[in-house]
Design a protein with these regions (language model features):
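Nucleic-acid endo/exonuclease domains
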Residues: 2-162
Length: 162
């Protein structure tokens, strides 16, 4: 899951409300705050979720299949999104840098742990691709390099070509 950003407020709620020029600004800013705070997943997943919602595309997040698991049945593999489009559906996976090279996001892992995580991730990716191929499921993989504009452009291009 993505990192949650916490903000420490130094102003009381009463002062915050009083600083707002209108009641609607207060309501809108509060709703906006909670919408962002409640979103789950990585930043890339949030961008995809917002893109799909804004384009009225139906989707399900963290799609699993009962017969696709890693190591044992308690570790079902998840696809980022199941997208319903044009009387059909397909799966979408975001592919960040950890899918292509060993990555130490937290900075606290040993080289051996980094390599093991990478190899396990590669195995899970292979299993997902194999499962989709075997079951005639369309799997779209979109690179996520941390640039929201690039991701949105890639999503637009993907939908144009469907």
């Amino acid at each position: 899951m993505g990192n949650k950003r916490r903000t420490i407020y130094t102003m009381s709620l009463k002062n915050y409300i009083n600083k707002m020029s209108t009641h609607s600004k207060f309501i809108n800013s509060t709703l906006s705050y909670w919408k962002i705070e409640k979103q789950k997943g990585s930043k890339g997943e949030q961008i995809v979720r917002n893109f799909l919602t804004n384009h009225n595309v139906k989707f399900k997040e963290q799609k699993t299949f009962h017969n696709l698991y890693y190591k044992d049945k308690n570790h079902l593999l998840r696809f980022d999104f199941q997208i319903f489009f044009k009387d059909s559906w397909f799966l979408l996976e975001l592919q960040g840098q950890q899918h292509y090279k060993p990555t130490n996001f937290g900075g606290h892992l040993t080289e051996q742990e980094i390599q093991q995580n990478f190899e396990e991730g590669q195995e899970r990716d292979r299993m997902k691709k194999e499962y989709c191929s075997k079951h005639n499921i369309i799997l779209k993989c979109v690179d996520w390099n941390g640039n929201p504009k690039t991701l949105i452009k890639d999503l637009q291009e993907m939908f144009r070509n469907l």
